């Protein structure tokens, strides 16, 4: 079994090392990851500049691009064949609710799914961790990767996995919740009197509704959320079909 591992925290992050080490128990692992932290870069793809990949050691490549670039380059350029599985992570910090639209880790799994390769994204709650917590998350990733390998996934579906720090009570199948951010823009003044801004500094407001990824994590459970490539809101069809859609160029 050939497994491609990537992330958005960068090739030197402790999370990807723990993940790759754990997945060696399932098959051959090749790491293709950004050469630096590319967190919150979403599904960005480099189209107007060349990419370079340096092999740091056998089976570990550092790419001067995004996580989505890494998946493309790994599948179409660096690996000897199409991988059987793509695993992204272990992300430093949970990717819950609205986070999935920003996360390079989640979007790496999405990119693999677009290419027809089964995939999962794995994130660990918090910001600083003991090595034992990374190992715990890596063990969970191995368990779920094996399940995906054995059982497969529905068409156009990938898994967003979030692991709580500390004691784990079990695993729950969840739906995407909401993780709303407060005032994300902080305005400052530099010594020359010019304004500058920091993004993403607001407090988070979690949706702890039962059945959501946020609630499962809050209760100490690993959250496994199946995500689909088709973002169509089918429930809105009835409402929108009542709109008058007659349109003329005259």
Curated annotation (Swiss-Prot):
Its EC number is 3.1.3.5. GO terms for molecular function: 3'-nucleotidase activity; 5'-nucleotidase activity; exopolyphosphatase activity; metal ion binding; nucleotide binding. Pfam families: SurE. It catalyses: a ribonucleoside 5'-phosphate + H2O = a ribonucleoside + phosphate. A divalent metal cation binds at residues 8-9, 39, 91. InterPro entries: SurE (IPR030048), SurE-like_Pase/nucleotidase (IPR002828), SurE-like_sf (IPR036523). Its cofactor is a divalent metal cation. Belongs to the SurE nucleotidase family. NCBIfam families: PRK00346.1-4, surE. Nucleotidase that shows phosphatase activity on nucleoside 5'-monophosphates. This is 5'-nucleotidase SurE.
């Amino acid at each position: 079994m050939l497994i491609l591992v990537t992330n958005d925290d960068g090739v030197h992050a402790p999370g990807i090392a723990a993940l790759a080490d754990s997945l060696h128990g399932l098959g051959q692992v090749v790491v293709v990851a950004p050469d630096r932290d590319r967190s919150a870069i979403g599904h960005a793809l480099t189209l107007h500049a060349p990419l370079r990949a340096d092999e740091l050691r056998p089976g570990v490549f550092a790419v001067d691009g995004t996580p989505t670039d890494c998946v493309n380059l790994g599948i179409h350029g660096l690996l000897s064949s199409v991988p059987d599985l793509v695993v992204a992570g272990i992300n430093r910090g949970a990717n819950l609710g609205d986070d999935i639209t920003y996360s390079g880790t989640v979007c790496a799994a999405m990119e693999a799914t677009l290419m027809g390769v089964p995939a999962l994204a794995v994130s660990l709650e918090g910001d600083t961790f003991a090595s034992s917590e990374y190992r715990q998350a890596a063990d969970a990733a191995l368990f779920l990767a094996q399940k995906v390998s054995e059982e497969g996934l529905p068409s156009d579906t990938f898994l967003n996995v979030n692991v709580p720090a500390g004691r784990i009570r079990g695993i729950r199948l969840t739906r995407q919740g909401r993780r709303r951010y407060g005032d994300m823009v902080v305005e400052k003044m530099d010594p020359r009197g010019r304004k500058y801004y920091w993004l993403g500094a607001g407090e988070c407001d979690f949706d702890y509704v039962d059945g959501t990824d946020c609630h499962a994590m809050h209760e100490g459970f690993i959250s496994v959320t199946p995500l689909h490539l088709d973002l169509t809101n089918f429930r809105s069809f009835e409402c929108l079909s009542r709109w008058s859609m007659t349109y003329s160029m005259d």
